[in-house]
């Protein structure tokens, strides 16, 4: 007859099997990740909230109090401003990276020219030569600020690209670079320098002009030119046909039909003006 195991041994072994089974169950269970906290300040969350408000406000059967609707409209405007600021920040970073090298090299070149001209001004004795050197020194100093404070959000226009293409002699390099035509922004930087550092920084960080503002500035010029052309045509027609009579529409004709020949004549005149030789 075999010996029986003590009660303590059987109990301890049973607990061991139970713990192992629990471990297997724990490891086999699928892991449920905790839901990530929603960042309400993130750009994606702001865009999602703005789209939700727009969809709500564009409903035909919208029935919410007027004060609640006003709050939603103000919230939507604030979200759109934040989205636009984020887009402008991204575009600004892209433009800075794109034109970083050319701005850096032109700034270094302008600083080198300014240093050379300062030495020449200190050594020169002829008044005419001193005046010319000072003028060149002023151009070099403006070139430095141009390379630094050119608006970040606008395509950079190089100062020395045309001069470098026509460079022949090393001796006249500074003269060749400093006496070439400058882009329009150079004059803006030159005038802004008089208002101080803060004005230059505002110019550097200004936002690009929109197409509507450009059209508004160009529209008066186009209207003036069109008015002059119309008056000139009218004067030529009056001089060529002083006694011409105006044709009246027949009774059976409509008002629009009587004006057709005149419209065709004006269209032919305008087309002839824009034709190339």
UniProtKB/Swiss-Prot annotation:
Its main location: nucleus. Keywords: Coiled coil, Nucleus, rRNA processing. Residues 266-277 have a biased composition (Acidic residues). Residues 206-221 have a biased composition (Polar residues). GO terms for biological process: maturation of SSU-rRNA from tricistronic rRNA transcript (SSU-rRNA, 5.8S rRNA, LSU-rRNA). Residues 1-38, 204-277 are annotated as: Disordered. Residues 22-34 have a biased composition (Basic residues). It comes from the Eukaryota. Residues 1-12 have a biased composition (Basic and acidic residues). It is found in: Nucleus, Nucleolus. One of its GO terms (cellular component) is nucleolus. Residues 66-126 form a coiled coil. Belongs to the EFG1 family. Involved in rRNA processing. This is rRNA-processing protein EFG1. It comes from Chaetomium globosum (strain ATCC 6205 / CBS 148.51 / DSM 1962 / NBRC 6347 / NRRL 1970) (Soil fungus).
């Amino acid at each position: 007859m075999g010996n029986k195991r003590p009660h303590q041994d059987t109990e301890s072994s049973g607990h061991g099997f139970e713990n192992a089974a629990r471990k297997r169950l724990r490891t086999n269970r699928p892991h449920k990740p905790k839901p990530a906290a929603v960042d309400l300040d993130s750009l994606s969350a702001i865009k999602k909230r703005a789209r939700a408000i727009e969809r709500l406000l564009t409903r035909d059967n919208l029935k919410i109090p007027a004060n609640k609707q006003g709050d939603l409209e103000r919230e939507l405007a604030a979200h759109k401003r934040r989205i636009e600021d984020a887009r402008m920040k991204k575009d600004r970073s892209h433009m800075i990276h794109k034109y970083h090298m050319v701005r850096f090299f032109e700034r270094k070149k302008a600083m080198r020219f300014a240093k050379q001209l300062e030495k020449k001004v200190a050594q020169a004795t002829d008044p005419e030569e001193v005046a010319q050197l000072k003028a060149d020194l002023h151009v070099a100093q403006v070139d430095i600020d141009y390379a630094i404070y050119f608006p970040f959000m606008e395509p950079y226009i190089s100062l020395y690209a045309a001069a470098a293409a026509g460079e022949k002699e090393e001796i006249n390099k500074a003269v060749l670079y400093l006496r070439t035509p400058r882009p329009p922004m150079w004059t803006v930087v030159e005038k802004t320098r008089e208002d101080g550092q803060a004005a230059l920084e505002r110019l550097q960080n200004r936002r690009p002009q929109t197409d509507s503002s450009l059209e508004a500035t160009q529209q008066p010029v186009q209207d003036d030119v069109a008015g002059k052309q119309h008056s000139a045509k009218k004067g030529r027609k009056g001089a060529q046909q002083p006694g011409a009579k105006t044709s009246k529409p027949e009774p059976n004709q409509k008002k629009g039909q009587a004006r057709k020949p005149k419209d065709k004549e004006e269209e032919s005149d305008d087309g002839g003006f824009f034709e190339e030789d």
